[in-house]
């Protein structure tokens, strides 16, 4: 049995699930999800209001009752070892080589935002992250627009909300300015020509005021509290031909789940503003990076739009 602790929003929970799914697949073990942290059960204390958000997918894994996880993690008798061995991700997203040697009966705690942790189980993860039909049906009209577009479609994600209003999150992640999106779109346009933008955001007013939008572009907004709507938005992202990401695990997954073999994915560099965080393995090597620190009068260098090495 592999048990993974869930925390954060949809994108974070997906990384946690994917890492646990890969470890379980290596050992032919069952994957169990511990939602006690986000539920606030069993004495767990979360600093943010979250909930279990993986219900939008057709998952076979189950969410364990907090009492069961508690029994597995601790020994009833002092002389007995806990049933599960705990493995915690190193601080600041540092690589965890112990994960590759982890055995069955392991409890995973961390964010695990590293594609190498589950690349050997990619087929399992993609199959598991199949959206339920009712999720896809929520935005069927927008999905039709994406499919009927005569020019390539681009999913562009803008995240503001907590990145602006929460000092801790703002200091760690930082916000992306209009110049990043402008340079990303210029780089895309130089390779594929005219495109139609589908902008997904928690701040539509900011997007309309700060992004270069045409009449044919679509801006679709949702508040952070609308979890079901965000799930349908991620599903829409997967339908687009190309992707411009925010520094958010949400749009990371929207791009990664896209089945297009010719997709171009643009991600900001650095991903996390706090330089203590390790970025090795966070961005797939075939994706491209645009520096987020450009000013409006500083065009990108010739080496900016290049594969990550």
Language-model features, listed with the residues they occupy:
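N-terminal pre-catalytic "stem/leader" segment of glycosyltransferase-like enzymes
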Residues: 1-42
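Short, solvent-exposed loop/turn segments at secondary-structure junctions
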Residues: 9-11, 37-40, 112-116, 159-163, ...
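Short, aromatic/basic amphipathic alpha-helical patches
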Residues: 43-57, 207-216, 277-284
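Secretory-pathway luminal glycosyltransferase catalytic domains
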Residues: 44-192
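Donor-binding and catalytic core of enzymes assembling or modifying cell-surface/extracellular glycoconjugates
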Residues: 186-276
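Leloir-type glycosyltransferase catalytic cores
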Residues: 273-297
């Amino acid at each position: 049995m592999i048990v993974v602790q869930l925390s954060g929003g949809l994108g974070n929970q997906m990384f946690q699930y994917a890492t646990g799914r890969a470890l379980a697949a290596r050992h032919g073990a069952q994957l169990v999800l511990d939602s006690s942290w986000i539920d606030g059960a069993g004495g767990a204390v979360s600093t943010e209001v979250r909930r279990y958000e993986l219900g939008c997918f057709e998952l076979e894994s189950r969410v364990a009752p907090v009492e069961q996880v508690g029994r597995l993690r601790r020994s009833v008798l002092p002389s007995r070892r806990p049933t599960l061995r705990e493995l915690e991700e190193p601080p600041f997203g540092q690589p965890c080589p112990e994960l590759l040697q982890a055995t069955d009966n392991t409890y995973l705690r961390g964010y695990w935002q590293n594609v190498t942790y589950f690349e050997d189980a990619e087929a399992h993860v993609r199959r598991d992250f199949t959206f339920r039909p009712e999720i896809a049906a929520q935005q069927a009209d927008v999905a039709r627009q994406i499919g009927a577009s005569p020019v390539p479609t681009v999913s562009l994600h803008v995240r503001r909300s907590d990145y602006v209003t929460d000092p801790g999150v703002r200091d760690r992640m930082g916000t992306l300015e209009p110049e990043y999106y402008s340079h990303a779109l210029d780089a895309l346009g130089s390779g594929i020509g005219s495109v139609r933008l589908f902008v997904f955001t928690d701040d539509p007013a900011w997007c309309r005021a700060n992004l270069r939008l045409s009449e044919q572009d679509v801006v679709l907004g949702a508040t952070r509290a609308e979890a079901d709507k965000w799930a349908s938005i991620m599903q829409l992202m997967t339908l687009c031909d190309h992707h411009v990401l925010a520094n958010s695990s949400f749009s990371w997954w929207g791009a990664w789940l896209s089945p297009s073999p010719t997709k171009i994915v643009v991600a900001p560099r650095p991903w996390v503003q706090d330089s203590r965080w390790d970025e090795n393995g966070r961005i797939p090597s075939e994706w491209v990076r645009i520096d987020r620190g450009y000013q409006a009068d500083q065009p990108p260098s010739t080496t900016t739009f290049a594969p990550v090495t």
